[in-house]
Amino acid sequence: MTALKNDRFLRALLKQPVDVTPVWMMRQAGRYLPEYRASRANAGDFMSLCMNPEFACEVTMQPLDRYPQLDAAILFSDILTIPDAMGQGLYFETGEGPRFKKVVSTLADIEALPIPDPHKDLGYVMDAVSTIRRELNGRVPLIGFSGSPWTLATYMVEGGSSKDFRKTKAMLYDNPQAMHLLLDKLAQSVTSYLNGQIMAGAQAVQIFDTWGGNLSAAAYQEFSLAYMRKIVSGLIREHEGRKVPVILFTKGGGLWLESIADAGADALGLDWTCDIGEARRRVGGQVALQGNMDPTVLYAKPEAIRTEVGRILASYGKGTGHVFNLGHGITPEVNPEHAGAFLRAVHELSAQYHE
């Protein structure tokens, strides 16, 4: 495999010295970029973009070609590929987001769910990873990812996205045995899926627990964090002669940083409601931190974006262990020039913290 020309993202996750704070953006390959919208039109629809390794590679590379400051690429895919491979029948309604043809509502439904084989059932994702690695040719590391079991379960039980998760939470409290079986199957599926991505060439992996923050503190521990801990313990942590860092990101998890830091990952993702300096004081001895600018700051003028970047860098303070990112995904209406101003500001303003 080609040697990495820029490994500062991996170094920061492992708390090794870096020259500047590395940066990437969740959803960096996305609708805010005109070139992405053109590729999506060529592919026909979102799923065709995900399921064709050449298209997935093309859109993964687009932000890197536009923004030389990006210190990592992230696989272009969707968290719902696993439930789709379990036979749920994923499709996208215009303006409505993801939907499933089948929903999971009974213990019998859950017992019937297969655990997908990453190579047979999700081979298009593995092919995309290896295609992107070839195309990157050592420029920056490639991040693989998955949704967390709890987050995937919400979509499977609700049949799509939800504001209140009433069906999922009813199952959790009425029939915890069924919910635990579903989460256990998903944890096994996520573990083999992420290990497949690592073997195909992903150099770090992130677990997106988008809806973990909607649980009570007790339910979060039992129904989300316990299964992420199980996944982390089963992941391949070294490949191609170097460590493969693991990032856990629970949106809304700021109250539970200590217990998330104990789950065994190398880094925690933070949303923007959490002060990164306070997070460092609480768990920075154990884990690296990733985040955490409010994505809507990108609607402000470049000078205001730069000021906010400076504030977050100062809050974190000197030394390594910080990967700059947004606190959630970049939104479709952002001006690409503002994203560029954000990325430039991170590198320009962070050098002083690494002298």
From Swiss-Prot:
Pathway annotation: Porphyrin-containing compound metabolism; protoporphyrin-IX biosynthesis; coproporphyrinogen-III from 5-aminolevulinate: step 4/4
SUPFAM superfamilies in UniProt: UROD/MetE-like (SSF51726)
Catalysed conversion reaction: uroporphyrinogen III + 4 H(+) = coproporphyrinogen III + 4 CO2
GO BP, sorted A to Z: protoporphyrinogen IX biosynthetic process from glutamate
Transmembrane feature ranges: none
Gene Ontology terms, MF aspect: uroporphyrinogen decarboxylase activity
Record-linked Pfam families: URO-D
Disulfide bonds: none
EC number, as in UniProt: 4.1.1.37
InterPro entries in UniProt: UROD/MetE-like_sf (IPR038071), Uroporphyrinogen_deCO2ase_HemE (IPR006361), Uroporphyrinogen_deCOase (IPR000257)
Subcellular location(s) per record: Cytoplasm
Site features described as Transition state stabilizer, chain residue numbers: 78
UniProt entry keywords in alphabetical sequence: Cytoplasm, Decarboxylase, Lyase, Porphyrin biosynthesis
Binding-site positions, substrate: 27-31, 78, 155, 210, 328
Cellular component, GO annotation: cytosol
Chief subcellular location: cytoplasm
Oligomeric form and interacting partners: Homodimer.
Function: Catalyzes the decarboxylation of four acetate groups of uroporphyrinogen-III to yield coproporphyrinogen-III.
Family: Belongs to the uroporphyrinogen decarboxylase family.
Protein name: Uroporphyrinogen decarboxylase
Species annotation: Pseudomonas fluorescens (strain SBW25)
